[in-house]
Amino acid sequence: MNIVSNRQEQAFSNPLAMRAASRNGSWTRETSGAALGYVQANLAILPSALADDFLRFCVRNPKACPLVGISEKGSPRIPDLGVDLDIRTDVPRYRVWEDGELAAEPTDISDLWSDDLVVFAIGCSFSFEEALIANGIGLRHVAEGHNVAMYRTNIECVPAGPFSGPMVVSMRPLAPADAIRAVQITSRMPAVHGAPIHIGLPASIGIENLDQPDYGDPTRIMPDEMPVFWACGVTPQAVIQAARPKFAITHAPGCMLVTDKPNAALIAF
C-alpha cells in the first residue's frame, strides 16, 4: 500500500482536493492516507441488466459487500457521497473488464460511459484501519508501506443470479490483546466490513500458506501475533470477474473513490 507522503497528505487533506487531483490526472496511485477521516469506497460499475442481481448479491453478503451508495441508471453521480463528485473521472485508476478479462486500466472512463450503467459504491477497510490506528493498534502493512495481504477462502458467498464464489479476506497480524480491541472497534463499523470473520487457524478457512496471498503483498507475522481476517472488498471484483459479463468497470486495487462522508457517520453504536 503506497502511503500518501506528508506533503501530499496536506494537499489531499480533504475529499474535494483528492477527487480534483484524480480528475486532472495529477494523482493516479493508491489513496491510502488521503483525506483522513472520510469514507473511501470500492467501485463496481455494471450494465443495468445485471444491476438487480448484483444488488441482491451485496444484500446477501453484507460483510464482504457493504453498500454505501448506488447511482441512478446512467448517472455518474451519487449525491449522498459527495459534492461535485463524478464517478467517470474522480478515481485515480480504474479497471475495465470484458468477458471477465482485464482489458485496460484507464485513469478516466468518460469515453466508456453509457446511459445503461449503474454504479455501486462499497465500503472500504481504509476507514476501519484509520480507527484502529487512532486507537493505538499498529498495522504492519501500513507501517511498512505495502498493500494488505488478501486471500481467497473456502467460505462461499450467498449467490445471486450470475454472481457467486468464495469470500476474499484481508489479513492483519495482531497481538491477542489488540485482536480483542480490533473486534470491539470494527464491530461498530458494519458499513466498512465490520468485525473480523475469523481469527487464527488460517487452514480452517482454506488458506494454506499465509506467505502466498492471492492479492496484495505478504505481511510478516511475529511469534507473539495471530492472523486476523476481515471480509474484503476484493470479493465483489472477484465474483464479477468470475461471472464474465461482457462489460464491467471496477476501481484498480487501492485506488478508491474518496467521498465527503465522514468515517464517524459509519459508526453504528
From Swiss-Prot:
One Gene Ontology molecular-function label: lyase activity
Main enzyme class: lyase
EC numbers: 4.2.1.-
InterPro entries (UniProt xref): D-Glu_cyclase, Putative_hydro-lyase, UPF0317
Entry-linked Pfam families: D-Glu_cyclase (PF07286)
Gene3D superfamilies registered for this protein in UniProt: PSTPO5379-like, PSTPO5379-like domain
Keywords for this protein: Lyase
UniProt xrefs under HAMAP family: Hydro_lyase (MF_01830)
Family of the protein in this entry: Belongs to the D-glutamate cyclase family.
Name the record gives this protein: Putative hydro-lyase RL2444
Organism: Rhizobium johnstonii (strain DSM 114642 / LMG 32736 / 3841) (Rhizobium leguminosarum bv. viciae)
Lineage summary: Bacteria, Pseudomonadati, Pseudomonadota, Alphaproteobacteria, Hyphomicrobiales
